[in-house]
Amino acid sequence: EVTAEMGASVRYKIGTMMETPRACLGADRMASDVEFMSFGTNDLTQMTYGFSRDDAGRFIPQYLNKKLIEHDPFVTLDQRAVGRLMETAVEDASRVKKGIKYGICGEHGGDPRSIRFFHDLGLDYVSCSPYRVPVARVAAAQANVMAQTATQR
C-alpha cells in the first residue's frame, strides 16, 4: 500500500540461507520459490559435524595432529561432507529451476582452497569478513585462471 501511495517501487529478490544439512537435501523443494541460495558454511559445517564452533578449538588441533582430519573444517571447507551437501543442493535445485544464483557467506569465503571448490561447483559469489576480501579476490582470480588453463589442455 505504501509503495503504491508513494509511487515508489522497491526491487528485491527472494532467497534462502542454506545452513543445515536438511536444507541442502531439500533444495529441490525450495527451488521454484527462490532467486538465490546462500550457503552459510560456518553453520552448515557445525551442523554437519555436530561440533560447536565455540568448543572446536579445544579438540580440532588434536584431530589434526592425529590426522583424523586434513584441515580445520572451520577454516577450509570439508569437500567430502559439507561440499557434497552443497553439490547435492545445487544439482537438485538446478534441475527444478534454472537461473538461481548460488553463493556462500562465512569464513570459508576467504579461504583459497575453499574458493577453488566454490568456483569448480559453479557458485556465483562468496561473501566473507572485510579483512579477508583481498585474499578472496586473488583466490577467485587464481581459480578462474586454473579452470581456463585446464579447459585449454
Regions found by a protein language model. Give the residues of each.
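Conserved alpha/beta-domain cores
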Residues: 1-153
